Curated annotation (Swiss-Prot):
Pfam families: Cytochrom_C (PF00034), Cytochrome_CBB3 (PF13442), MoCoBD_1 (PF02738), MoCoBD_2 (PF20256). SUPFAM superfamilies: CO dehydrogenase molybdoprotein N-domain-like, Cytochrome c, Molybdenum cofactor-binding domain. It comes from Pseudomonas putida (strain ATCC 47054 / DSM 6125 / CFBP 8728 / NCIMB 11950 / KT2440). This is Nicotinate dehydrogenase subunit B. It is an enzyme of class 1 (oxidoreductase). Induction: Repressed by NicS in the absence of 6-hydroxynicotinate (6HNA) or nicotinate inducers. In presence of 6HNA, repression is alleviated. One of its GO terms (biological process) is nicotinate catabolic process.
Length: 1187
């Protein structure tokens, strides 16, 4: 492991006594620069590569970092080989700016091919020196000495350890180009598979990842990003902040600071959860943002419309003449989508800006470039900044790892304490520099003899280096667009075309973008290899044979032949030659490439060839890559098994990119905010991978990391063509694209669902309240609009009631759910203030604690009982029937007295309820007198002598204390609960559907008494789902009741025999044409399946409800499902259920609509399709309700 803080720095080693140092003067690379900009030549510096210490340690240093590719192991093998050490005797240090040489960014798989060369020479230099020193001491020629495990051994048995040879002096040697390298025939480590040195520490939980790094006195930070995600240029960048209201989080515990520098806004707190909450609740005002991204609904056209600067990197023969004279012209366009680096863990960093020194623990891919950016940001010398590189959550390219380091530095500077910052998942996905889209256009064709007439290739690459975000937000750099010459990787095809022209269209980004694995080479090779496949079939020649005709590179020819042989390739000249297996079509595709990386003309890395086998379901359009045979020639393989690991990883990642990955945009903003909106390949979808590595141990090592992925897209697309006869020139090749290309045959996820019935459910009681007042006016002659005040009394003493009565009162209060409506989130129980939004205004629940001024402390029992039974307050005012006195009138006297005693014995809370905000005429309380005269019945509940005691107890609790009809019965035009067949037939409350309870045994998934009992007791039923919304706190209260009472409620409800709602018979199938069920399926698999896997996945946090039987999915209305998806279940009904996150900050209205439509189609296919889901999702998002 790289416990680099325990390793002396370069300066410490240079000053140390008892050490052999192998150094060299190097000129640090400048890093990528914009087109037309002259790179800044940095001063030469002394770089340290090898340190042999008298404490027995051998340190080796390389400026690149290990991204999970295993270079720490391979580099250690190289050093150990040259110095005849064991692997455990080499401490490999990577990337740390105070220790490792500045060898530039870790990109293009260039570590072993380029950056390891000086390290190997340094080890050879050290070996020669140590042998020379030993020869002098032992009095024998160096040829008579050998080295074993760090000890020099003479032929007579005399020994000297490395530590002894370097004692007492500081030996500094420059790398000697003439130092003899070990003969390949003598290798004992290089060329043999070695276990990864990093795996044991990761497997046993050693401190490895930057996310786990902690320091004493450390604080936690979070950042609030501006509204222009996806942009890194424009006048608004760094100039959009209006105000930050620090008072909005003044009440939160643990907040240390709010840091504002132009558009950079961050919060610092003592604990991480405090920082998260502060960032969420801090009120930040931004200027209205109108600078939207270009219209990316048509990415290809957006690229074509983007200004460009052309450069031709190859022009040979007569391209125009060849095209003009072609017997068959083929003009093709290929499109690569925007993709994410998709780091599994959001970027994280820890900065310590104290005592004049700045230290940053980072997962960066570019430590030295990051140090330069931070020096620019802080306007200080680079020497003050130390980057300590730790491993991160996986990224090949430029994600937000550097951005978050700058965030942490700014926050640490503000508070002068170490600060750890981690981005949210949404920030990582939205703000990371995307892997850019790329458009490749080819014009060419065939001659009459099947030879290539001409090849005119253009590639357009809208990307650049994506400046570190804090530099832009703080105004340290100007937000001007820049052109980077990075679209030319592997732009020249590997084939010998006589007439060929290659043109690069350099352009500024459409979206914040930067390099990603296979920078421009994967897209370019997708076009090259798809096009030659088309040429082969058009010429009537087998695709492998056709490639071989146009290859002259001997190693390429050997690889193509060997790979075809390994895969048992069957020559063919037409697609669809494999017998279909029912609805499954099978095909094979071939592709070859050599990755050419770095600044044009670049360097050639490893050669790679793919044979991909696919299965295509022509009914659903689903594509499975079932097997990949991959041939690979990387020259000398330092660690063959490590190379194999890299190839496997590349196959998996590139298959995911070809079949699934695409950033989605809505209204010109990034919509892929989490895994539901950006699906990646899952374990069940992995292909079988057969790796064939050509033995080339006498050849120089070539970069192998990215090379294996370069032919991937074309191989898979060519295989799909072989299976279906259809060419796909745009990625990803998703099921809906395949199904559409196949003519829409079959039943895919988008197949029509049954029709939506025309019947509509009634709304919350205010929905039709307008009719109340017209009727009430006609009743004023017989109803009293004003009632007498009942005089206030002195609050009863605390000891006025027995413990038994108080316990009975507690149970009555629990059964009546008093605290559910009379307590705000985070507030004192029963102190009121809960807002209840209605179409006609807002009501606020009252304070029912015994406070004499703001509560019911001066209410007599008579006043309390009148309010409960008649809806009249102590002062004579009418209450709105949102307070369910129409049910509470059923409560018997003993329970009413117990409830009064319980409430009056609670701790008083002085809290004035906000004034109701009802619009005229609904704010005229006297008008409720007529309503009461018409709909309020009198008297307590009377038991049914024909029924059991349990049934009667259940009816009493349901119709009285529990006031279930208040939510679960529909209302008439005057807002009163309907009876008869409509009793408990369902209703709406606070935007939630309260389902029908009067025919539970006849519902689509029948409720048994036991299921209902379990649900009411725990909030969960395996056959129906989880209690959410207003039902959650109801269950919480029911859980405190005697089990016999809950059983009585279940018994009573299960006995009801209402009429189940019938579906429209033989209705014409309808589908909401504005939703994509395929996209909904992807969202479900990416965001939901981990928990809702029908028992197939792990049980992690509480229950994992099945969507197949979820009542919300089978409901006539989508409201409850949408509310749970968007707002989650932040407070579960009982602790064992587990928390469900809401996705309102992660999924757009369209994505939520697609998800809901898919769930309905997948799990309730016999029900009518929901309509207008996107608008309904927007409505639910804007109106979260109070539950």
């Amino acid at each position: 492991m790289n416990h680099s803080q325990q390793v002396p720095s370069r300066d410490q080693l240079l000053a140390k006594t008892g050490v052999l140092l192998i150094v060299d003067q190097i000129t640090p690379p400048s890093g990528p620069v914009a087109k037309g900009v002259t790179p800044t030549v940095k001063e030469r510096e002394l770089a340290l590569f090898i340190a042999v210490s008298d404490d027995g340690m051998v340190y080796a240093f390389n400026g690149h970092v290990d991204l999970g590719t295993g270079i720490r192991t391979s580099l250690a093998q190289i050093v150990a080989e040259e110095l005849d050490l064991r692997m455990d005797q080499v401490h490999m240090v990577l990337g740390d700016t105070e220790r490792a040489p500045n060898q530039g960014a870790t990109i293009a798989s260039a570590t072993l091919q380029i950056s390891a060369v000086p390290l190997r020479k340094a080890a050879a230099t050290a070996r020669r020196y140590l042998l020379q020193q030993a020869a002098l001491r032992l009095g024998c020629p160096p040829e008579m000495l050998r080295i074993e495990d760090g000890t020099v051994i003479a032929s007579n048995g005399s020994t000297l350890s490395f530590a002894e040879l370097v004692q007492g002096k500081n030996h500094q040697l420059h790398i000697a180009d003439d130092a003899p390298l070990k003969a390949i025939e003598d290798y004992r480590l290089v060329g043999r598979s070695a276990p990864r040195v990093d795996i044991p520490g990761k497997a046993t939980g050693e401190l490895t990842y930057v996310h786990d790094m902690r320091l004493p006195n450390m604080l936690h930070g979070r950042v609030i990003r501006p509204p222009y995600a996806g942009h890194d240029s424009g006048d608004f960048v760094g100039n959009s902040l209006l105000a930050v209201d620090e008072s909005s989080i003044a009440h939160l515990p643990g907040v240390v600071a709010v840091v504002v520098i132009r558009d950079f806004v961050g919060v610092v707190a003592e604990r991480e959860e405090q920082a998260i909450r502060a960032a969420h609740e801090l009120k930040v005002s931004w200027k209205p943002f109108t600078g939207k991204l270009p219209d990316l609904s048509d990415v290809a056209q957006a690229i074509r419309d983007n200004p460009r600067v052309q450069r031709t990197v190859l022009d040979q023969g007569d391209v125009d003449g060849g095209i003009a004279n072609a017997s068959q012209r083929l003009s093709r366009s290929y499109l690569w989508p925007y993709q994410l680096h998709a780091s599994i863990g959001p970027s994280c960093a820890l900065a310590d800006f104290t005592a004049g020194q700045i230290r940053v623990w980072s997962g960066t891919q570019n430590p030295h470039l990051l140090r330069a950016d931070l020096a620019w940001l802080l306007a200080c010398d680079e020497a003050r900044i130390e980057i300590i590189r730790m491993e991160a959550a996986g990224c090949y390219g430029r994600n937000c790892a550097d951005d978050v380091c700058a965030d942490a530095v700014l926050l640490s500077r503000a508070v002068q304490r170490p600060v750890r910052v981690q981005l949210t998942r949404e920030q990582e996905h939205v703000w990371e520099p995307k892997g850019t889209a790329q458009l490749m256009e080819i014009d060419g064709g065939l001659n009459a003899d099947g030879s290539v007439a001409a090849y005119d290739f253009q590639t357009s690459y809208p990307s650049n280096g994506a400046p570190t975000l804090a530099l832009l937000l703080t105004g340290a750099v100007e937000p001007v667009p820049a052109l980077f010459e990075m679209g030319d990787r592997t732009s020249i095809p590997p084939y010998d075309y006589e007439h060929m022209r290659v043109t690069i269209n350099d352009m500024t980004p459409l979206v914040r973008a930067s390099w990603m694995r296979g920078v421009s080479a994967m897209p370019n090779s997708f076009a090259h290899e798809s096009y030659i496949d088309e040429l082969a079939f058009a010429a009537g020649v087998d695709p492998v044979e056709y490639r071989l005709k146009h290859l002259s590179d001997p190693r390429a020819i050997d690889l193509v032949k060997a790979t075809a042989e390994r895969a048992q390739w069957q020559p063919h000249t037409r697609p669809m030659q494999t017998q279909a297996e029912g609805d499954v079509l099978r095909g094979r595709g071939f592709a070859y490439a050599r990755y050419i990386h770095s600044k044009f003309p670049g360097f050639g890395a490893a050669w790679a060839a793919w044979v991909a086998d696919v299965a295509v379901d022509r009914r659903t359009g689903e594509v499975a890559v079932t097997r990949v045979v991959i041939g690979h020639d990387a020259g000398m393989m330092v660690n063959p098994e490590g190379v194999r690991h890299q190839i496997h990883g590349n196959v998996i990642q590139s298959t995911s990119r070809v079949l699934k990955e695409q950033v989605s945009f809505e209204e010109s903003t990034v919509a892929s905010k989490e895994w539901g909106g950006y699906p990646i390949l899952t374990f069940p979808e992995l292909p079988a991978i057969d790796v064939m590595m050509l033995p080339r141990q006498h050849e120089p090592p070539m970069g192998s990391g990215e090379s294996a992925s370069v032919p991937s897209a074309a191989a898979i697309a060519n295989a799909i063509f072989d299976a279906t006869g259809i060419r796909f020139r745009e990625l990803p090749i998703t099921a809906e694209r395949v199904r559409a290309a196949l003519g829409g045959e079959g039943q895919g996820p988008d197949a029509p669902a049954p029709a939506q019935p025309s019947t509509k459910r009634s709304k919350w009681w205010f929905g039709s309240l307008a009719g109340v007042f017209g009727a009430a006016l006609g009743m004023l002659a017989t109803a009293l609009p004003w009632r007498a005040e009942i005089a206030p009394v002195t609050p009863p003493g605390v000891g006025s009631w027995s413990a038994a009565m108080l316990e009975r009162g507690r149970q009555v209060a629990a059964a009546g759910d008093c605290a559910v409506c009379h307590t705000v989130s985070g507030g004192k129980a029963n102190a009121g203030g809960l807002a209840m939004d209605t179409p006609f205004g807002t009501l606020y629940s009252t304070n029912i604690t015994p406070d004499p001024e703001t509560g019911i402390g001066r209410w007599s029992f008579a006043a309390f009982e009148r309010a409960m039974r008649e809806g009249i307050s102590r002062d004579g005012r009418h209450l709105y029937p949102a307070f369910p006195y129409t049910s509470f009138r059923n409560i018997n006297d003993a329970d009413m007295q117990a409830l009064y005693a319980y409430l009056m014995s609670q701790t008083p809370v002085r809290q004035e309820a906000p004034a109701n905000q009802m619009r005229f005429p609904f704010n005229q309380r006297p008008l409720m007198a007529g309503w009461n005269a018409r709909f309020l019945q009198r008297g307590e509940y009377q038991p049914d002598p024909q029924r059991s005691a349990q049934w009667n107890r259940g009816a009493y609790l349901v119709d009285g204390l529990g006031h279930c009809t208040a939510c679960h019965s529909p209302r008439n035009l005057m807002g009163a609960e309907k009876g008869g067949s409509s009793y408990l037939a369902g209703g709406m409350v606070d935007g939630w559907e309260a389902p029908a309870l009067n025919a539970l045994g006849k519902s689509s998934t029948p409720w048994s008494e036991d299921e209902l009992f379990n649900y009411l007791s725990t909030g969960f039923s395996e056959k129906h789902g989880v209690a959410a919304g207003p039902m959650g706190p109801v269950v919480s209260e029911l859980a405190t009741l005697p089990k016999s009472d809950v059983r009585a409620i279940a018994h009573y409800l299960s006995s009801l025999e209402g009429e189940p709602q019938a579906l429209a018979a033989n209705a014409a199938p309808q589908v909401d044409t504005h939703v994509s069920l395929s996209n909904g399926e992807r969202v479900f698999k990416g965001a939901c399946l981990g928990c809702h896997s029908d028992g197939l996945g792990p049980k992690l946090f509480g229950v994992s409800p099945s969507m197949a039987v979820n009542s919300n999915v089978h409901s006539d209305l989508p409201d409850n499902l949408l509310r749970v998806v968007l707002h989650g279940i932040p407070t579960p009904a009982t602790r064992d259920l587990g928390y469900m996150p809401g996705f309102k900050d992660s999924l757009s209205d369209r994505q939520v609509a697609d998800l809901a439509a898919y769930l309905r189609h997948r799990f309730a296919a016999d029900k009518p399709a929901w309509q207008g889901l996107a608008s309904k999702a927007a409505q639910v998002r804007a109106n979260p309700g109070s539950h």
